[in-house]
Regions:
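Short amphipathic alpha-helical segments
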Residues: 17-18, 44-46, 71-72, 119-120, ...
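Conserved beta-sheet core of the metallophosphoesterase superfamily
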Residues: 121-168
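Active-site neighborhood of phospho(di)ester-bond hydrolases with catalytic His/Asp-centered motifs
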Residues: 6-7, 31-36, 57-62, 107-108, ...
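N-terminal active-site segment of His-dependent metallophosphoesterases
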Residues: 1-56
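Active-site environment of divalent metal-dependent phosphoester hydrolases
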Residues: 10-15, 39-42, 65-69, 113-115, ...
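N-terminal start-of-chain detector that recognizes signal peptides
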Residues: 3-5, 29-30, 109-111, 127-131, ...
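Active-site neighborhood of divalent metal-dependent phosphoester bond hydrolases
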Residues: 47-108, 114-137
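Beta-strand-turn-beta hairpins that frame and shape the catalytic cleft
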Residues: 1-4, 100-107, 151-155
């Protein structure tokens, strides 16, 4: 079964709609979003509702976590978190998993067990060495950069950001 894999949509419903309208996306039997479905973009509710309507597997990203615990975060986007929380009134994000296993693949937002931890290609050999022996593929998002790295018998992949591209 083909899988549509995306990360870091960040409330950008226009970007999600554009992705879903492609023939490639329409031929996929499964949809997975690696976290940060919400915040920054103006339509977090539409993003979450659309993904749920599609039966997508959604992971917990750091922005969903921040919405669940807003008082723990007094950073630069505190006000934006409050606006996003208002948009999502009545929608629960607390049940989103941090990690998902599919066969020998481990999917996560940041690093396994931690949606806040950023990982970059130079750090991947160390991160991959901490995985259970039966995991051969790590798929993560969070840093908005697309990369594909092999280290030994393991591979790590990041699809980049679907809704908040920071690479130009």
């Amino acid at each position: 079964m083909r899988t549509l894999l995306m990360a870091d949509i960040h409330g950008n419903f226009a970007a999600l709609r554009a992705i879903l309208s492609t023939p490639e996306a329409q031929s996929c039997g499964r949809v997975i979003s690696l976290g940060d479905q919400v915040n920054f973009g103006p339509e977090s509710r539409k993003v979450v509702e659309t993904l749920r309507l599609l039966g997508a597997t959604m992971l917990m990203g750091n922005h969903e976590e921040r919405l669940l615990h807003p008082d723990d975060f007094a950073g630069y986007n505190w006000a934006m978190l409050r606006v996003t929380a208002g948009q999502l009134s009545g929608i629960s994000l607390a049940d989103l998993p941090v990690d998902v296993r599919i066969g020998s693949a481990l999917l996560t937002h940041g690093t396994p067990g931690d949606p806040y931890h950023l990982v970059y290609p130079p750090d991947l050999p160390e991160v991959l060495n901490t995985l259970p022996e039966d995991v051969s593929l790590l798929i993560s998002g969070h840093n908005h950069l697309c990369w594909d790295v092999t280290s030994g018998h393991r591979r790590a992949f990041n699809p980049g950001s679907a809704g908040l591209n920071e690479t130009g």
